[in-house]
Amino acid sequence: MKRKGYILEQIADPDNLRHAYWNAQTGKSAKKDVIAFREHLDSNLVMIRSRLLDGSYRFGNYHYFTIYDPKERVICAADFGERVVHHAIMNICAVDFENRQIPFSFACRKGKGTLAALKQAARYQKIYPWYLKLDVRKFFDSIDHAVLFSQLQRMYKDARFLNLLWRLIDSYHSIDGKGLPIGNLTSQYFANHYLSYSDKYLTEQLHQKAIVRYMDDVFLWAYDRDELIEKGQRFENYVQENLLLTLKPFVLNKSEHGLPALGFHLFPEETRLNASSRKRFAQKMKQYDIMLKNDAIKDTRCAQNILSMYGFIACAKHKGFARTIVKGFDAEGSNRVNRVIIYCLTI
């Protein structure tokens, strides 16, 4: 593909910045930093535009917090103004990243996502007797800045835009010269693109057919066990030498024994929630029960959240489990939340 130029002017376009603001504030309009930005919206957008165009815009005003869902992760979140810029960049550039993905990559893509990845993996589980699971150790913290930037240079020739991208990449370090902040919108696209080179290695050099990749979780299937072992070793060598990444130990098994993937356990004949997903689901349902009883959440918002949760587990054998969770609710909150849950159980 040809490298693209004249990108920075498109990103700094007033209409694009305003669109980016609306995208960034979606679902967060009541937060203090969003309200403060909105009170001086026009002047803030003019300032961002000016600094983007004159090259003085700087990233790095981060704050950190830890989540434990399902495992411990340190999230690095930019302030709201920077998030507007992230959205402004991706409004223009998302299509360029999308065009460099191949069909079996499912993260950060419209029309793809977790459920699509699971459905494709479930199909392969029925066809192939063996699977190999590959996972990058500390993926976001291990992404090499120089390697990533060289990849972006192959996409764009706008020097001012590339300087902006370098300042964004260089604003965060897990160790010197490495790491992307998990909380940034741009990080999700950059990280997914980083591994697109290994996707092409799998398909073009190893001629692997049955693949599912969701960010740094890579799953391969084959009829022959030794074929998977050889391809896994060659893939590991490639990412070590070319992407400077380290893989966790391989998980090689028969499909009939089940594939642990993305919060589920996939068998040839059925898909089940794994133990940690069941635990998180039960905890969240109890939280909504308490919030409803205390009028801490509106029924409509609760319904939206619960429907989203049910959408996540829709591909699994789950209805008996969900009914068991419902029985544990106290009466007052349950009467309200049950109406939502009963509806979910019928879809």
Where are these regions (language model features)?
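Conserved two-metal-ion catalytic palm core of "right-hand" nucleic acid polymerases
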Residues: 1-148, 156
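Conserved polymerase palm-domain catalytic core
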Residues: 44, 51, 103-104, 109, ...
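A general structural signal for alpha-helical elements within enzymatic catalytic domains
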Residues: 53, 94, 153, 200-203, ...
